[in-house]
UniProtKB/Swiss-Prot annotation:
Disruption phenotype: Splenomegaly and development of severe liver disease characterized by extravasation of erythrocytes, sinusoidal damage, loss of liver sinusoidal endothelial cells (LSECs) and fibrosis. Normal life span but there is a significantly higher occurrence of liver tumors in old animals of more than 1.5 years of age. Significantly reduced levels of Glmp. Conditional knockout in LSECs results in a tuberous liver appearance.
Main function: Lysosomal dipeptide uniporter that selectively exports lysine, arginine or histidine-containing dipeptides with a net positive charge from the lysosome lumen into the cytosol. Could play a role in a specific type of protein O-glycosylation indirectly regulating macrophages migration and tissue invasion. Also essential for liver homeostasis.
Reaction catalysed by this enzyme: L-alpha-aminoacyl-L-arginine(out) = L-alpha-aminoacyl-L-arginine(in); L-arginyl-L-alpha-amino acid(out) = L-arginyl-L-alpha-amino acid(in); L-arginyl-glycine(out) = L-arginyl-glycine(in); L-alpha-aminoacyl-L-lysine(out) = L-alpha-aminoacyl-L-lysine(in)
Annotated protein name in UniProt: Lysosomal dipeptide transporter MFSD1
GO molecular function per UniProt: dipeptide uniporter activity; protein homodimerization activity
Keyword annotations of the record: Lysosome, Membrane, Phosphoprotein, Transmembrane, Transmembrane helix, Transport
Induction remarks: After 24 hours of starvation, up-regulated in the brainstem and down-regulated in the cortex and striatum. Following 8 weeks of high-fat diet, down-regulated in brainstem and hypothalamus.
Membrane protein topology class: Multi-pass membrane protein
Domain notes: The dileucine internalization motif is required for lysosomal localization.
Family: Belongs to the major facilitator superfamily.
Length: 464
């Protein structure tokens, strides 16, 4: 208990400092009101977790309403997948600029509020596109939504680093990711049901029903905006009481660092892009796939399509702990990519219960994120981390934008079987890149595949 209290005081300033800062009076604040106390930081943590809830809830609105969007807006799958492509396009650039805008232009508090406003406005425009039967307006809404979505995640992480440090931080990141996946899961299972209720209320299906349903979904974005405003107030208050600095991302983006990227880092980029383009576009198109191939009802198809996110919510923190304790990142990535390949092959070539394949995909997706992304920190020096992660997210969004359009074209012209073969090819390329990374890393000393004990020994033998 004494150590924990000491950590709290070191984290955000001493309690004595907090007491003396309020109107100059040396009286103690209550635990809920004292920014240096755990109870207050738990309130802040809950606001941080809900900060991204609306964004993740609304991101997969098109997937949850795939049938309704295509029918009511009279568009084919290629145009439908543009709703995902338009989200990704701005983030090809904003992944480099988001941290800069937060650090140098807006500050963390205003940056979070502004990006939350972009998310809200984008969702409103998206819903208005349905109400006015204007698909171009829906595309515009997704573009505006995308401007805020990814940068809001950067702001969320910046708040986390500002308020929590050391051993707490991994748990906080895990809880934030879990809440994000809960938002995606609730969307997948709620929006179809909500559409049915609105349809019964208005007396018919159509673009108006779709637009009203999407507008109701905007409530989650407004809720997240309220959390952003509350966080800004509490962070400003803590800054005054504890005399602490406003949080910064710590990202230093230098495009000239790209020329120094090594072969292992390039292979990590290839693994990342080829893997995620076989997951997110598949989920975006998955509902109708399960309805057509496996004869699921609309509600059952939504449920199985959301299982990846349901599994990811509790398993991401657990897998993060597992990788931290064991090391061997490349081996875990190899297992994750191989399991994903098996999952897609089962869905493509068998009629086995798809719950098996989707659960396998959920576990492998969660494991890959925990093992792949930390590897970047083992490859590049600390001063290049911002550039490396920014570039990784940028090309990931570029890949998602291009593959979303391509997947829609394949589905329209060739059907789901060839689309699954295409996804299998993407995962196979990712698997090949993992094998190449293993061989290259082995030739260079094998640091990416060190066990946790080996890494600990390396730290002790090379103190900073």
């Amino acid at each position: 208990m004494e150590d924990e209290d000491g950590e709290d005081r070191a984290l955000l300033g001493g309690r004595r400092e907090a007491d003396s800062a309020v109107h100059g009076a040396p009286r103690a604040l209550s635990a809920l009101c004292d920014p240096s106390r755990l109870a207050h930081r738990l309130v802040v943590l809950s606001l941080m977790c809900f900060l991204g809830f609306g964004s993740y809830f609304c991101y997969d609105n098109p997937a949850a309403l795939q049938t309704q969007v295509k029918r009511d807006m009279q568009v084919n799958t290629t145009k439908f997948m543009l709703l995902y492509a338009w989200y990704s396009w701005p983030n090809v650039v904003l992944c480099f600029l988001g941290g800069f805008l937060i650090d140098r232009i807006f500050g963390i508090r205003w940056g979070t509020v502004i990006f939350s406003c972009f998310v809200c406005i984008g969702q409103v425009i998206f819903a208005l596109g349905g109400i006015f039967n204007a698909f171009w307006l829906m595309e515009l809404g997704r573009f505006v939504f995308g401007i805020g979505g990814e940068s809001l995640a950067v702001a969320q992480n910046t708040y986390a680093v500002s308020w929590f440090k050391g051993k707490e931080l991994n748990l906080v990141f895990g809880l934030q990711l879990s809440m994000a996946r809960i938002g995606s899961t609730v969307n997948m299972n709620l929006m179809g049901w909500l559409y049915g209720k609105i349809e019964a209320l208005l007396g018919s299906a159509g673009h108006m029903t779709l637009g009203v349903t999407l507008m109701i979904g905007c409530i989650t974005c407004i809720f997240s905006l309220i959390c952003a405003l509350a966080l800004a107030y509490l962070d400003r208050r803590a800054e005054k009481i504890l005399h602490k600095e406003q949080g910064k991302t710590g990202e230093v983006i230098k495009l000239r660092d790209i020329k120094d990227f090594s072969l292992p880092l390039i292979l990590v980029f290839v693994i990342c892009v080829c893997y995620y383009v076989a997951v997110f576009p598949f989920i975006g198109l998955g509902k109708v796939f399960f309805m057509e191939k496996f004869r699921f009802s609309s509600q059952s198809a939504s449920a199985i399509n959301s299982i990846v996110y349901i599994i990811s919510a509790p398993m991401s923190p657990l897998f993060g702990l597992l990788v931290d304790k064991t090391g061997k990142n490349i081996i875990w990535v190899l297992y994750a990519v191989a399991a994903t390949l098996v999952s897609h092959m089962m869905l493509a070539f068998t009629f086995w219960n798809p719950w098996i394949a989707m659960c396998l995909l959920g576990f492998s997706y969660s494991l890959l994120a925990c093992a792949l992304w930390p590897m970047v920190a083992f490859i590049v020096p600390e001063h290049q981390l911002g550039t490396a992660y920014g570039f990784m997210q940028s090309i990931q969004n570029l890949g998602l934008a291009v593959i979303a359009i391509l997947a829609g074209m394949i589905l329209d012209s060739k059907g789901y079987l060839l689309l699954e073969v295409f996804f299998i090819a993407c995962v196979s390329l990712s698997l090949l890149a993992v094998v190449c990374l293993y061989l290259v890393n082995r030739a260079q000393g094998g640091n990416l595949n060190y066990s946790a004990k080996q890494r600990e020994r390396m730290k002790l033998s090379h103190p900073e």
